[in-house]
Amino acid sequence: MATTKKVLNWLRREARRGLTIGGLCTAAYPMAKAGLLDGKRATIHWENQDSFAEEFLEVDLTKSVFITDGNRLTTAGGTSSIDLMLKMIADKHGEEMANAVADQMIYSSIRTDQDTQRLSVPTRIGVRHPKLSQVIQMMEQNIEEPISPAVLAKDVGMSTRQLERLFRRYLNRSPKRYYMELRLQKARNLLMQTDMSVINVALACGFASPSHFSKCYRAHYETTPYRERGSHAQRLSI
């Protein structure tokens, strides 16, 4: 996300004045670039979590729908901005007023900063199988250093063959294929949302070499990582 020096300087100037500054969704990027989120808890849309975390190590990034940390406010975007607004109303005017506003808006489920953004794994994949969900969660949490199917199976009390059958039955693909798709999805996000080198993107997604990464990426997306980044940059410049 391109941000001009003028915008960054303006943000820093307003921050020095002690103003409360908030960013909705990807507006957390200019806030972080201006140093406004250093040492602060913050959030951003789940699609941008990986790239944001790679770029801003000094920010305590969470998966919450919104975060208030002192006079810094961030949201995941979408309807989470409504949740933040209702919290601000509740803080200043009480829960009754916030509930009345939500009722007027036909907003029946008010979330707090303890609520996470994404749907549960069973809801996302449309399958309610505890062990399958557990394995997918482990995969999602271990992209940089992938876990072998044998270890994944052992961790949920299954044999490798049983795990293979489970994935093919419910997801129509092998555990290895599903895991690879998760890693490539993260790689694609990093290529399009960060300035990380292709080599570093490969390492961040568990690939030992750029050549292997490029081969897998091309097989899945029908283009190379370098071309993906180039075409994305070209689209942004139009």
Describe each model-derived feature in a short phrase:
Residues 165-166, 177, 189, 215-216, ...:
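DNA-binding alpha-helical recognition surfaces that contact promoter or target DNA
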